[in-house]
Amino acid sequence: IRDRRRSRGLGDVYKRQAQGKAVDLKRLGEKYDIDVEIVSPLLMGGEVISSTEIRRCVREGEIAKANEMLGYHFGFCLEVEHGFQRGRTWDFPTINQQIPKGRVMPKFGVYCSAVEIDGNKYAGVTNIGVKPTVHVETAPLAETFIMDYHGDLYGRKLKLELHEFLRPEKMFDSFDSLREEIAKNKEQTVRYFEENKI
């Protein structure tokens, strides 16, 4: 059975170099006896919701706005890899997830996040970037401190959701300064999830 219906938005483009418009598709539909429905764009706060705008928000750290447009929390489902385990010595054990090339890259920085483990969600603090203070990574990494969870997660594929952007990634003068900032970010995340659903 061939699908003979298509729905497109007024601003939709297709074909090589996005030259085709929805109205052209309607014309082609009439020619080949395919029902084409042109729908009005979906708006949020007077702005058109589009994949281009969502990607822009993710890249510029406007993650809360991106989430609102998506209708769910932006994130990744990636394997947990071994790191340098420095966080354990600071009482902030973390998981590391390598972000593959080709993915929409969130702005480097620290986020309130949530990690799903065995069907349960745990609040977390996630740094996305290259960890300039500790060890400069060659590829962007998501490093997450998971609150109220203790267990071995190496090799497991876990879903990470970004909820709120806290601050840009930066290089600290010392490990002590970095540790103090992580503690502060943890407090911010606790407050965030006291007011928002995980």
Protein language model regions, located:
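Charged helix-capping and loop-helix junction motifs
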Residues: 18-26, 143
